[in-house]
């Protein structure tokens, strides 16, 4: 029994320290399971990495007319900021779910000063044909949508653990 505990503890210790922390947006940090590839395509910033069990990615998308919104936001009350964020996040999550054709578990969250949504659903993995878990945290950050998503490649407990570790590693300044 002690050997099993030692192995589990060692594995957990190693997996925690093999994480790669990145600042994905001004003041928002996340720990990727491996060093992610960074790219910018059509103004969308993306970080992506894959393990044997999961694909982890982050996308940062500017709000249309972002500069005008940032000027107007200076005069918004906290209630008005929340109202704008909620409206934008509601529309964003509805579009994502409509394009996937799935129903999801959606719950409001707040990370630091940023409003967001936690989204969880199942979908068919096109590579394997297996139904696997997908989970996202979408934050409204300075007139940007920051989508932090993890797609499990299989239904193993290790895949679910990697997904949860990734999504729970989000920190803000």
Regions picked out by a protein language model, each given a short descriptive name:
Residues 31-80:
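Secretory pathway targeting signatures of secreted, lumenal, and periplasmic proteins
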Residues 1-21:
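Bacterial Sec-dependent N-terminal signal peptides
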Residues 76, 80-84, 155-162:
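Extracytoplasmic/periplasmic, Sec-exported soluble proteins
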Residues 12, 66-71, 97-102:
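Short acidic/polar alpha-helix capping motifs at helix-coil junctions
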Residues 20-25, 29-35, 41-46, 85-137:
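Signature of long, low-cysteine stretches enriched in small and polar/charged residues
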Residues 48-69, 105-173:
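Short, well-structured beta-strand
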Residues 13-15, 78, 142:
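Generic detector of N-terminal low-structure segments
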